[in-house]
Amino acid sequence: MVNEYKRIVLLTGLMGINDHDFRMVKSLLSKELKLNRMQDQYDRVKIADLMEDKFPKDAGVDQLIKLYKQIPGLGDIANKLKNEKAKAKRTRTGKRKTAAKRQRQEEPSTSQPMSTTNEDAEPESGRSTPDTQVAQLSLPTASRRNQAIQISPTIASSSGQTSSRSSETLQSIIQSPKTPKRPSSSILDPPVSSGTASSSAQALGVPLATIAKRQRLKNVPKEPSEENGHQQGSKKVMVLKVTEPFSYDVTEEKMFHATVATETEFFRVKVFDIVLKEKFIPNKVLTISNYVGCNGFINIYSASSVSEVNDGEPMNIPLSLRKSANRTPKINYLCSKKRGIFVNGVFTVCKKEEKWNYICYEIGDDTGMMEVEVYGRLTNIACNPGDKLRLICFKLIPDEEKAQLRSTTHSNMQVIKAKN
């Protein structure tokens, strides 16, 4: 039960909030968790481990509920935590009741052997009415008739009149006058196999792949699709782009970013197990499962969440979808977007200004200018006006006066030097 509570704490409580709120939660829980200076840099997974040790009863679910009710904007998550905890309790209680009921049902069956004597069988047959006997006979008879129709279609077609009269006679015999039975749907509407559909499409001269592709190309998404919370189902995707692993905190924890796509949408992915770098190869098809959606990203923490696909079925990713997933957004487009989204792209550096704890770059394109604030480890990367910056996972911060990009914990950037 504690493991279930920890799942709620991590996937709903900690992964469901942004980085700013997470730092606030760590600060408010620092005394209870007795965080030292190094532990102040712990990520969500490690904080969940500490909470499990500190609050063995419920892994800290109640503590998060109390905190989130006091933090503006987190009331909905507090209610969600409360509901999921109640649901976990009900599930646990239901499993106990089911186990007890199954145990009670098994006890008499083991103590009383089944009787097969004629004395026990005769009273049962004596209670059967003519109607029930007809109903009992009708099922095997109809089953044999169904088998006859399905197994020998040539015989039925060669003697159509005889089959018609026989089926009508048999129909009148097996049907009860009180409760007439409808014929099986498998007889009336024979299933259409994939081979039949394929041959029909080919007869029209239009390949199925072309039809599906045309349907997929109608609406090409401009933004990555988002999923929220823990996702246990599987998703078949193709890898479009992947970065090299990099250290993202003072404890030298490593991760890498990737862009993947289905045939209709694309996703941004954060991978926190660098062993998976061997599987994330461009144009490779993978199945991902048991992941967490948060802040517009799919977060993968375990190698067991990714498996290679070798079913021989190719994925046809439209070229327009590939271009959309790799496109650098225009600055005027970013200025019109809601704040809080994360941005990838290559931008030209027009100006550089070093502040006391960060570097401010001014980037530009043919639609406008925008500031980029770079903090922490990324300030050590040498970049000058005229160079290009490849930004990965930079946040469009809330600012009423002007749009601005800012680096976060999982941001990274690369410099493309200007040609002399």
From Swiss-Prot:
Top-level taxon in the UniProt lineage: Eukaryota
GO BP, sorted A to Z: activation of innate immune response; cellular response to interferon-beta
Residue numbers spanned by region Disordered: 82-201, 216-236
Major localization listed first in the record, in broad terms: nucleus
Extent of Basic residues compositional bias: 87-102
Sequence ranges of Polar residues compositional bias: 108-118, 126-151, 170-201
Domain HIN-200: 219-416
Residue ranges of every copy of the Pyrin domain listed in the record: 1-87
Cellular component terms (Gene Ontology): nucleus
Entry-linked Pfam families: HIN, PYRIN
Bias kind Basic and acidic residues: ranges: 220-229
Keyword Nucleus in record: yes
Protein's cellular compartments: Nucleus
Record keywords: Nucleus
Biased segments, Low complexity type: 152-169
PANTHER family (alphabetical): INTEFERON-ACTIVABLE PROTEIN 208-RELATED, INTERFERON-INDUCIBLE PROTEIN AIM2 FAMILY MEMBER
Similarity annotation: Belongs to the HIN-200 family.
Name by which UniProt lists this protein: Pyrin and HIN domain-containing protein 1
